[in-house]
A protein has these predicted regions:
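Extracytoplasmic substrate-binding proteins
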Residues: 72, 82, 161-240, 261-263, ...
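Bacterial N-terminal signal peptides
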Residues: 37-48
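A short, structured surface patch at a secondary-structure boundary
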Residues: 72, 91-157, 162, 260, ...
Length: 372
């Protein structure tokens, strides 16, 4: 070796390295053939020694090869529970449609083996093994276990009783399901890391942020006093709406509307007809997948509702029930539907994406898509 730093893991070759017994004693009486044999032996010895790493046992953490060493991934779910993975999950069961859609959106759809009966998007999700309905009572634990899952994704707010039973079977279970746009971004990263698709998750987030900006860039130019009062009917019996802490309430605000229940302290409060009448919304929005599909006739039959501005002016709109009811990537499609229905002139020049086919339906108008 010549020039540069010497490697500490290699023998250093020099004339001083030769054993004393191997050196010539200067005697001319030794036969030439003997000296040649000794010289040949030393040449071979030093050639091997100079190319053999110095064994340092203290620097070797184990006898395992680098391929045997597994990296541990740590995830913290919505309940603050820590879940550790030494391998990327390949047999995932999702108990929420929004979670299922998010997994497909980040490229982890082929790692799913089971989902609920309500997981209907994308179409590939309908081919997964059904593990029951979305409610706690409707979920089949036996079916889930038969799929030999290495990860179960449940709802943090309604599936908590499932956690302990599956933990007893040593099945990792994470409590997820966001309820704001910011939480959706966080969950995309969480699931991206857990499934080995973190880069795709960040890419999805950036695309969603750009689209939100494109859809809402005009909102700040509308004075608060000119924004339309909106009521979103989550359910009819009992009458429920969306508060500001819910992603639906967030969409109303992003879409330039004033939620008449912006003072609600819970996500989906029960309300009375009298309060709705008193706050007199200019816009009424509801999911198309209502228990009984909303119509002007139904609203007008409610006591006093025929006096509400939105009913009198026929400003009642149905929004795609799946998109508007799931805090997932398609919630931005629902946001666009809302804006197109309420402020139809605002999106003409601001969208960065190809416009979707709007599925919002003005209640009372003739439109076969109302039953989609």
């Amino acid at each position: 070796m010549s020039g540069g730093a010497q490697s500490p893991f290699l023998f250093k070759c020099s004339s001083q390295s030769a054993p004393r017994w191997a050196k010539s004693n200067g005697s001319e009486s030794q036969p030439i053939s003997v000296r040649l044999h000794i010289l040949f032996f030393l040449t071979i010895l030093f050639a091997v020694g100079c190319n053999k790493p110095l064994p340092l046992p203290s620097l070797s953490p184990s006898n395992k090869s680098s391929e045997d060493v597994k990296t541990e991934t740590i995830a913290v779910d919505r309940l603050g529970r820590t879940i550790r993975f030494t391998e990327v999950p390949q047999r995932i069961v999702s108990l929420s449609p929004s979670t299922t859609e998010l997994l497909y959106a980040i490229g982890a759809g082929n790692q799913l083996v089971g989902a609920t009966e309500h997981c209907n998007y994308p179409p590939a999700a309908t081919r997964l093994t059904r593990v029951g309905g979305g409610t706690l009572q409707g979920i089949s634990r036996e079916t889930i276990l038969s799929l030999n899952p290495d990860l179960i994704l449940c709802k943090w707010d309604s599936h908590q009783p499932l956690i302990e039973p599956f933990e007893r079977f040593k099945v990792p279970i994470m409590a997820v399901c966001p309820d704001t746009l910011a939480e959706l971004y966080e969950e995309a990263v969480l699931l991206g890391r857990a499934t080995g698709h973190e880069l795709e998750a960040h890419d999805l987030i950036e695309k969603m942020k750009r689209r939100v900006l494109a859809l809402t860039s005009w909102v700040d130019s509308v004075p608060m006093e000119k924004r339309r009062r909106a009521f979103y009917e989550v359910w009819d019996e009992p009458l429920m709406t969306a508060g500001p802490k819910s992603f639906i309430g967030e969409m109303l605000e992003l879409g330039g509307m004033k939620n008449i229940f912006a003072d609600a302290t819970v996500r989906y409060p029960r309300i009375s007809d009298e309060v709705v009448l008193d706050r007199d919304p200019q816009i009424i929005l509801a999911p198309s997948t209502h228990r009984s599909q909303l119509s002007l006739e139904i609203l007008a039959k409610r006591q006093g509702w025929d006096r509400i501005t939105a009913v009198r002016e026929r400003q009642v709109f149905l929004i795609d029930g799946d998109q508007v009811s799931r805090c997932g990537p398609r919630m931005l499609d629902a946001l666009e539907e809302m804006i197109r229905a309420v402020y139809p002139d605002k999106l003409a020049n601001v969208l960065e994406k190809e416009p979707i086919d709007s599925k919002s339906v003005r209640v009372g108008d003739s439109n076969e898509d109302a039953n989609r």
